[in-house]
């Protein structure tokens, strides 16, 4: 229901997205890619029972006579998911994360990057006004959130997307260590694209290489985790690539 609702009003977000400095393609990835994440997780939810747990896989016999067995089950956390997000995808960054915790029945506190938080706020306002989610299941903090993880408990989850330096600082918070809080970090990455020696001009592989490198360098001005930052090309093909 949430995915369908957001898809029906998606055009509302494009004008404000442009004010973040995003091109139409950038906005399309952020807005419709984010909503697509909600659709994907909604489909995944259909694979789970309407129970507060999910039996994962088959029983594993651990003793000769079956007196000792093992069986995994999935259960939701009993706390809250705190999502600290990056500036480059104010909608996608939030939707891809909250889709997971909402599927598990876990509420979320979202802290978007201050510089583009107004776009996240618009999306959250539309979600809240729709009354599709239970009251309080999605909360937003714009601006400074200093101390946001200083009071987390064992059942809470913290996710962070941003720079490695900030992520390491958060990860070292004594409270996270003391309470064994789950911390997931997506930080700086160094991605490369490698052109094979047989991928010469005129081949589909060469054309795809040029297309993807150009796209990854220009979408969001290269400010995203999957951007190609190193291009490795056989010496004999350097001139063709240039």
Regions found by a protein language model. Give the residues of each.
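Hydrophobic packing residues within well-ordered alpha-helices of enzyme cores
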Residues: 17, 38, 120-123, 151, ...
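Conserved small-residue-rich beta-alpha loop and adjacent elements
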Residues: 50-134
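ALDH superfamily catalytic-core signature
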Residues: 126-131, 155-157, 166-242
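N-terminal Rossmann-like NAD(P)+-binding subdomain of aldehyde/semialdehyde dehydrogenases
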Residues: 1-65
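A structured beta-alpha segment of the ubiquitous adenosine-cofactor-binding alpha/beta core
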Residues: 70-71, 138-159
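Flexible, acidic loop-helix segments that line cofactor/substrate-binding pockets
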Residues: 14-32, 146, 188-191, 198, ...
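Hydrophobic residues in well-ordered beta-strands that form the structural core
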Residues: 110-111, 142, 185-187
């Amino acid at each position: 229901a949430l995915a369908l609702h957001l898809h029906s009003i998606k055009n509302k977000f494009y004008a404000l997205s442009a004010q973040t400095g995003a091109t139409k393609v950038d906005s399309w990835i952020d807005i419709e890619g984010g909503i697509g994440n909600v659709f994907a997780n909604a489909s995944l939810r259909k694979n789970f029972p309407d129970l507060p747990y999910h039996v994962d896989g088959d029983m594993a016999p651990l003793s000769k006579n079956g007196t000792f067995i093992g069986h995994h089950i999935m259960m939701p956390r009993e706390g809250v998911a705190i999502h600290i997000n990056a500036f480059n995808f104010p909608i996608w960054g939030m939707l891809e994360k909250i889709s997971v915790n909402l599927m598990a029945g876990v509420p979320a506190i979202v802290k978007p990057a201050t510089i583009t938080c107004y776009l996240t706020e618009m999306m959250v306002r539309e979600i809240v006004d729709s009354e599709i989610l239970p009251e309080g299941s999605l909360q937003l903090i714009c601006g400074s959130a200093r101390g946001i993880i200083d009071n987390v408990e064992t059942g809470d989850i913290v996710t962070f997307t941003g720079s490695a330096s900030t992520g390491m600082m958060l990860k070292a918070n004594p409270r996270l260590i003391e309470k064994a809080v789950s911390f997931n970090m997506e930080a700086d990455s160094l991605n490369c694209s490698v052109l094979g020696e047989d991928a010469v001009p005129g081949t589909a592989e060469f054309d795809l290489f040029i297309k993807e490198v150009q796209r990854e360098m220009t979408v969001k001005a290269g400010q995203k985790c999957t951007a190609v930052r190193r291009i490795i090309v056989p010496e004999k093909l350097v001139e063709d690539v240039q």
